[in-house]
Amino acid sequence: MGSSRFLVLMVSLALVTLVAAEGVKGNIEKPEVCPADNVRCIKSDPPQCHTDQDCQGIRKCCYLHCGFKCVIPVKELEEGGNQDEDVSRPCP
């Protein structure tokens, strides 16, 4: 009787560990950076994505042209982009 309770406890702990690990790996950011966005918006568009994991292939979830969308990233900021601005994060 004691060994069956131990087995149930171990299986339960294993399942909890797997579920927790799945949640952690869901927010992995893809390499490279979002393209520079110098567009001034009066109103933001509804987001087409929330994280890089929402985008297929190499595409990243970037704020570009008034809304979050999946775009092909660039290796570095384009000429004329604000080098000090973190364009991969939403504006405050």
From Swiss-Prot:
Ranges for domain WAP: 27-74
Function statement: Antibacterial protein. Putative acid-stable proteinase inhibitor.
A biological-process GO annotation: defense response to bacterium
InterPro entries in UniProt: Elafin-like_sf (IPR036645), WAP_dom (IPR008197)
GO molecular function, one term: serine-type endopeptidase inhibitor activity
Keywords of this entry: Antibiotic, Antimicrobial, Disulfide bond, Protease inhibitor, Secreted, Serine protease inhibitor, Signal
SUPFAM superfamilies: Elafin-like
GO CC list: extracellular region
Keyword Disulfide bond set for record: yes
Main location: secreted
The organism of origin for this protein: Aotus nancymaae (Ma's night monkey)
Gene from which the chain derives: WFDC12
Keyword Signal found: yes
Compartmental location: Secreted
Signal peptide (residue range): 1-23
SMART domains per the UniProt record, alphabetical: WAP (SM00217)
Disulfide cross-links: 34-62, 41-66, 49-61, 55-70
Protein name, UniProt field: WAP four-disulfide core domain protein 12
Superkingdom, natural source: Eukaryota
